[in-house]
Amino acid sequence: MFAIVHMSDVVRIPPNRLTHSLNDAALQILKEKYESMISPEVGYVIMITDADPSSIGKLVAGDGATYHKVTFKALAFYPKLQEIIEGEVVEITDFGAFVRIGPTDALLHLSQITDDYLKSDVKQGVIVANQTARSLKIGSKIRARITAVSLGKGAGMGKIGITCRQPFLGAVEWVADEIKKA
């Protein structure tokens, strides 16, 4: 789920940035620190949208920088368990597919695609069901449910697991076929 989150921090504005406006300097420093970061509290920080630094800062002896409290807004993506998401298949492997959801990729394991037996062809970039002949290939749009979320700290990649083994989940074409049958 995408959200605008309100955060606060203390930023160190070095002497070479004091020629810029306080707001611009603080915003640039926050972008360098937070954008592309993963936090267990807010999820994937995509971008900093607004910063409001305190005009009163602190000086530390021996350091030419000023320290300012700042409140800011960030656009974040926080994957929630059981959430239904839509994404695009970006990679096919011998154990499943990676699906782009927001700023990251989620793993769709072979056992979580469908109840049918599956054959994965990595060279062709396709997964084919044996009985129904349904296929999942790079570029396919899918609808899935998030079943596992593990967000690390810092810039490390989090891990997200998804499933399509429920009614009205899977490739968009599969869902359209199920709706016609219902």
Residue ranges of predicted features:
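Single-stranded RNA-binding regions, centering on S1/OB-family and related RNA-binding modules
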Residues: 1-182
